[in-house]
Amino acid sequence: MPENAQVIMRYGPYSSIGLPVEHRTYRLEGLLAVLAEDGHQVLLEKIEDWNVVELMVNGEVVFRCNIKDLEFGGDGKLDPLCREARIAVLNAY
């Protein structure tokens, strides 16, 4: 994947510690940081599927996971899912 590619991050609502279900970006911070570090432009798009995060490159989903499996906050460098997502984006064409 060329540097400065556009990545669409689609994310759904989730419930956190008894709070109502809604779209939150706290668990996306590490993933956003990892992709920004590689120079990618990331557009956030809300979807209605609960607990889902998808990364799309060139109209194709290259990575998908449960949003609750991502680490809360942080820079994403120690999160294995962020590493997996980064590799998926870099390998996308």
Swiss-Prot record:
Signal peptide: none annotated. Pfam families: UPF0728. Belongs to the UPF0728 family. This is UPF0728 protein C10orf53 homolog.
